[in-house]
Regions:
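Second-shell loop/turn segments in exported
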Residues: 1, 7-12, 22-31, 60-68, ...
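Extracytoplasmic/periplasmic mature domains of Sec-exported, cell-envelope-associated bacterial proteins
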Residues: 1-6, 16-19, 36, 50, ...
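Conserved catalytic neighborhood of penicillin-recognizing serine enzymes
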Residues: 1-23, 73, 106-120
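Short, functional N-terminal and low-complexity linear motifs
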Residues: 4-12, 39-48, 103, 131-136
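Alpha-helix boundary/interfacial micro-motifs
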Residues: 18, 24, 34-35, 141, ...
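Mid-domain, small-residue-enriched loop/turn segments at the edges of structured enzyme/sensor domains
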Residues: 27-81, 85
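Domain-terminus/edge residues, biased toward the C-terminal soluble/receptor-binding domains
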Residues: 49-50, 67-208
């Protein structure tokens, strides 16, 4: 049979959503799909996911004695944010997911060219979940992630692009990065007739 490198499998997975690429990667990295799912679940908890349980490496429906394969829009946003901005492999992730094509693989993420600042995105589909999409965008130092679930079924494959633009547009128009000054009283202590004063601290926050 034909042989592929791990790099080629990653492009096949992220650009074309090939399920067999996901399985091959899982078996190569962890030895089995089950062991790989365990790694995924541990990583999901590590980055703050609250309601995610992986069974399959490709996202297809599955169930076992511990539950069913599932996640939430919030957790998907956390995963995308980690991949784009926090992961030690973020540069490689962006290189792959931003490629319009690689060899025989063509990127199905048309949204990359539909809005300024789009950094990455991943499409998905199952009969139960419908068309799904998760993406990351950065403009003027502001960072946003969105997740669309059940965003249409066959014959409505392009709904997700319009909805993604609407959500990102809302975020850009509504929220802003603010510098918040927080007054914090540490403690009052009498020392030789002197009283300590309240201290102030500056916290930079992104309001999203």
């Amino acid at each position: 049979g034909q042989q592929y490198s791990l790099k080629e499998l990653m492009y096949g997975l992220m650009l074309e959503s090939y399920n067999d690429c996901a399985v091959a990667i899982a078996e190569h990295v962890a030895g089995s799909e089950e062991a790989f799912a365990k790694m995924l679940n541990e990583k999901a908890k590590e980055i703050g996911c609250k309601d995610t349980y992986f069974i399959t490496p490709n996202g297809l429906d599955a169930e076992n004695e511990e539950g069913f394969h599932h996640t939430t829009a919030e957790d998907l946003c956390k995963i995308m944010a980690y991949c784009v901005w926090e992961s030690p492999q973020k540069d490689s992730f962006l290189e792959i997911t931003q490629a319009r094509a690689y060899g025989e693989f063509v990127n199905r993420n048309a949204f990359l060219d539909q809005m300024n600042g789009v950094l990455s995105g991943k499409t998905g589909f199952t009969a139960k979940a419908g068309y799904c999409y998760v993406a990351a965008l950065e403009q003027n130092g502001e960072r946003y992630t969105i997740a669309l679930l059940a965003c249409g079924w066959p014959n409505n494959k392009t709904y997700k692009w319009k909805d993604a633009k609407t959500l990102f547009g809302y975020g850009l128009d509504t929220y802003d990065k603010k510098e918040i000054i927080v007054e914090e009283v540490l403690e009052y202590i009498d020392i030789d007739g002197y009283v300590s004063q309240p201290s102030f601290s500056t916290i930079n926050q992104m309001v999203v």
